[in-house]
């Protein structure tokens, strides 16, 4: 999954806390 600056994975849609 590609993690974006906002912490959201663009592909899986999982949020990184």
Curated annotation (Swiss-Prot):
It comes from the Eukaryota. Its main location: secreted. It is found in: Secreted. GO terms for cellular component: extracellular region. Expressed in skin glands. Keywords: Secreted. Belongs to the Frog skin active peptide (FSAP) family. Septenin subfamily. May act as an antimicrobial peptide. This is Septenin 1g. It comes from Osteopilus septentrionalis.
